[in-house]
Amino acid sequence: MGKNVVVLGTQWGDEGKGKIVDLLTEHAAAVVRYQGGHNAGHTLVIDGEKTVLHLIPSGVLREGVQCLIGNGVVVAPDALLREITKLEEKGVPVRERLRISPSCPLILSFHVALDQAREKARGELKIGTTGRGIGPAYEDKVARRGLRVGDLLNMPRFEDKLRELVDYHNFMLVGYYKEPAIEFEKTLAECKEYAELLKPLMLDVTAELHDLRRAGKDIMFEGAQGSLLDIDHGTYPYVTSSNTTAGGVATGSGVGPMFLDYILGITKAYTTRVGSGPFPTELFDEVGAHLAKQGHEFGATTGRARRCGWFDAVILRRAIDVNSISGICLTKLDVLDGLETINICTGYKDAQGNAVAPTDADSYVGLQPVYEEVPGWSESTVGAKTLEELPANARAYIKRVEELIGAPIDIISTGPDRNETIVLRHPFA
């Protein structure tokens, strides 16, 4: 029998999921995205060549691997087609392997305009969205007024629905945000072009996944963003608009929880965050600058500098529970090379010194992290492929992290290339 393996982030995103998905898809027949949109930025480095993917599953660089976009993903046709073209220009065959669920909500021009208008209006209170229309598209889905990929198959009906949506959103754009109106005819013309290009890619992804499962094929489910950005379980309201935790796999693909065999949580050896929101272990000193520089901490989607801080075992324990994590992949261990001492956050205290466990953004206010200091290492870990190649203090750090989070570290990433990896227990084994 095949195995269904989920790869998801356990922090605030940018944990290095793309590399690990690419690594593990050597064993997979298919890779499926199940939530988010082109706000994701998955960076792959293969033989020194960097590729950044936003919407297409990271298995696309593996020959013969089927790439599926499940119903939980919001699809911006223009962004998807740009990504396809860019890959095809590199000689990567995409269209014959990429299939999209007709149930995927569409992101159209008015969603992007609304997203950007809202962030502009919030000023200093902005959430820090990518401004790509993700949230407004999910809102339309939940309000049951959204257009979906499959609607492009019936253009007369699509035109009627689109007119209603453009009128609805222009009312807010013009009347409240004082922004220019979206042109209906221009948007319709664009959608007609999208329809011709997307029709050959449409497929009942849920049915395909179950056919693969029954045929005994290995399937990889690729998460986007991170657990602490989950709309329900994250640091609300500084979150994304989808379920980034393991529950999103079932709803976003149609493959039920009982069919998920292994859930791999991707975790940086330190912590980063892009945009606004609480971050208890954030560093503003030379160590934070070291992590940012050595880790090349700039968002693959937005280019924004990431905030950097010490490893936080508290948020990891929460993510492990919420996702029922089977094992952890610890990434960017090499970024800690050269640090004399390293701190690990083991808890939080409020102003009165009481131990607390925050559940939303407001409950983080005023909290101080409680640190455990461990010795660092001066030797390089870059490119290590076995545990024995790591410095003794690096091995001790890994062991201590395991003890604090209560989950096994099954994979360790020691560099950006797919080959710079230590695999202690293979998820597909």
Swiss-Prot record:
Catalyzed reaction equations: IMP + L-aspartate + GTP = N(6)-(1,2-dicarboxyethyl)-AMP + GDP + phosphate + 2 H(+)
Cellular component, GO, one term: cytoplasm
Highest taxon of the lineage: Bacteria
Signal sequence extent: none
Residues given in the record as Mg(2+) binding sites: 14, 41
Catalytic residues (positions): 14 (proton acceptor), 42 (proton donor)
Key words, A-Z: Cytoplasm, GTP-binding, Ligase, Magnesium, Metal-binding, Nucleotide-binding, Purine biosynthesis
UniProt keyword Ligase, yes or no: yes
Positions bound to IMP: 14-17, 39-42, 130, 144, 225, 240, 304
SUPFAM superfamilies named in the record: P-loop containing nucleoside triphosphate hydrolases
Cofactor: Mg(2+)
InterPro entries registered for this protein in UniProt: Adenylosuccin_syn_GTP-bd, Adenylosuccin_syn_Lys_AS, Adenylosuccinate_synth_dom1, Adenylosuccinate_synth_dom2, Adenylosuccinate_synth_dom3, Adenylosuccinate_synthetase, P-loop_NTPase
Protein localization: Cytoplasm
Pathway stated in the Swiss-Prot or TrEMBL entry: Purine metabolism; AMP biosynthesis via de novo pathway; AMP from IMP: step 1/2
Role, per record: Plays an important role in the de novo pathway of purine nucleotide biosynthesis. Catalyzes the first committed step in the biosynthesis of AMP from IMP.
Subunit structure: Homodimer.
Protein name: Adenylosuccinate synthetase
Organism per entry: Pseudomonas fluorescens (strain Pf0-1)
Gene coding for it: purA
